[in-house]
Amino acid sequence: MRRSLPARLAVWAVLAAALSSASAAEAADPPTGQYRAFWVDTFNTNLSDHADVLAVVNNARAARANALFAQVRRRGDSWYLDSLEGPAEIVAPAKPLAPGFDPLADLITEAHAAGIEVHAFVIAAAIWNRHPTILAPPAWPDHPFNRHGFNQATGALYTERDNWLTRTLIPDGTASVTFSGTRIGAEFWVDFGHPDAAAYTADVLTHLVERYDVDGLHLDRIRYPEITIAGQTPTSGTSIGYNETSVARFNQHYGRTAGTNPAQNDPLWNQWRRDQVTNVVRRIYLGSIAINPQVKISGSLIAFGGGPTTEASWNSAEAYWRVYQDWRAWTEEGILDIAAPMAYKAEHTATIRPQWDQWSEWTKNHAYNRSTILGQGGLVNAIEGSLRQVRRAFTPSAAGNYASGLSFYSMATSNIAVANNPFSIPAGQSTPVRSFAEFASALTTGRSVDGTRAYEDLAANPVPVFPAEASVPDMPWKSHPVAGHVMGFVRDEAGQVVDTGAVNIAREAGADPPPATRTTIVGATDGGGFYGGVDLAPGTYRVTVTPLGQPAYTTACATDVIAGQVRRFDVTIDREAPTVVLGASPRELWPPNHRTVNVTLAGAAEDAGTGIDSVSFRVLDEYGLVQPEVAPISGGGLPRVDFSQAIPLEATRAGKDKNGRTYTLEVTVTDRACQARTAAVTVVVPHDQGH
């Protein structure tokens, strides 16, 4: 039976000297600021020219908002010009982008001038939503759907490693499934269990962070798709994630029969799918803050149905078992700065109303060392219902914990009509859809724009929910960091990535006592060999890697973790120290006339693993006199380095030294895995010539 990693790789078991955060249930101080954000979805809000951008910013200002989650990637395309992907896919009659216009750059300029943060809102996994044969394919030839979804030349899906799409085993024609299980409803999704799809997504998004002065990167649909079909339960699992490459990786890792599919309720398969999503979140998080330590990584997270009421009931939440998005583990690990569950609940429906409070309670109690905000759904509420939810969002949980704010979905649909609205004033009136200006006025005054109509009981609530502007909350792990992070890639002796290899990141013993944060993290590499550790105590660390079926390998090199920084520490498994062949000429210095003689130290160093890093020299004199230093030679990672070095030695000895004077010439060869081998030769100044 094959030895495998523990099931909960996604959580990354953490061994800590002490944790700086309180437990999930411990009370926290109320935040000093308050996030007031709007989702700006480009499906329903234009960002096509400067006038559109000004309209969005002015709406935010009117509502006293301080952050915008503005959608700039919908389906593998870009609402920004400096991108690794093609331009925005806009289909008539939607408004096209003005020529040469960069929506994201312009929004950053205008919003920052107004004191408003801009978070780039990106759809991560869903990459295409039109029929590939009836309607036109993506316009950009290198669109991931064109290259790794549907092959227009053959009129068929790509196969094997070339196919990045996730897949259900539910037959086509059932539950709106088509295209051999790869189209769920209207959508095609990439599968993060495919290493190339995960790497591509991380590269696209970290490139955005590198090129734009965004305050944050906001991840949407960072999960598997939900499938609407009867009979799905936490026990049954879901038929999704069956990308051929991901399944092959799973079978290899767990010693399953190649070419077979795991059952949808297989516990190992369930955790595997959660791990694939968690791995890409970790990779995006560390890659982004390595570029800009102050950028805030957030996510719009699944909050279907009612919220968990106990720790154990999280496993029955649909985020966990249906779409394999274990976002509770993400906040605990620290790979999201802001968790924003989409708790879109109709306040006017008595059976649904408690769900808002359940998710509010859970969210406030599960921030750990990070922030949480509540995603409020204007798209399912009248203004009156939304105001009630906002007020409850800013109260503490029963355990005394607070959310850091909330975000409204969306700027385009801030409210809906509600028949017999129980919260209208007076109660029971049918309320129509109101304008965004009315919604903003309700937030800031509690009244309509013209002041004639109240949106809540002003006697009970004399102060509106947003009576004045608010600053965004401080994030002390960014403003005053006490912990650092490490990330890298692991390759084996043949240079191949180590897929799902066990990883242990450990602080060296004997170092200064760390602050109250992590000193050891246990986890695994992803399918591309990526690993990472978050919130480590500053100090010196080594990494131990255990590839499947192989002995553990601990790096001879170490890396220093520094508070507030991400250290890049790649690992190539190299179990053999370099070899060195050494000779010297002359080996005897005669006559002993006190003159300096150049001894040629020549040889060759070889390392078939990581290559030669350096060749260094040392002269030892039995008389104990200090000898001149000799500069080392860089190996440049070459597998072989030939060297010839002149070493100046004094041809002299003590007159009564019958054994003569002995110099020992050492050469130390170090490879790029920090393994070293030393060879030495002796040179003698004899008492008598020939002796």
List the predicted regions and their residue ranges.
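Structural motif
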Residues: 487-500
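Short Pro-Gly-centered beta-turn/loop motif in secreted/extracellular proteins
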Residues: 530-542, 548
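Structured interaction patches on ligand/partner-binding surfaces of diverse proteins
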Residues: 548-569
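Short, acidic Ser/Thr/Gly-rich low-complexity loop/linker segments typical of extracellular
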Residues: 497, 501, 507-535
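Active-site-adjacent "subsite" loops/lids of carbohydrate-active enzymes
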Residues: 31-37, 45-47, 125-207, 211
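Proline-threonine-serine-rich low-complexity tracts
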Residues: 574-691
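Catalytic domains of carbohydrate-active enzymes, especially glycoside hydrolases
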Residues: 52-77, 336-338
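Substrate-binding cleft of secreted/luminal carbohydrate-active enzymes
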Residues: 324-352, 363, 367-475
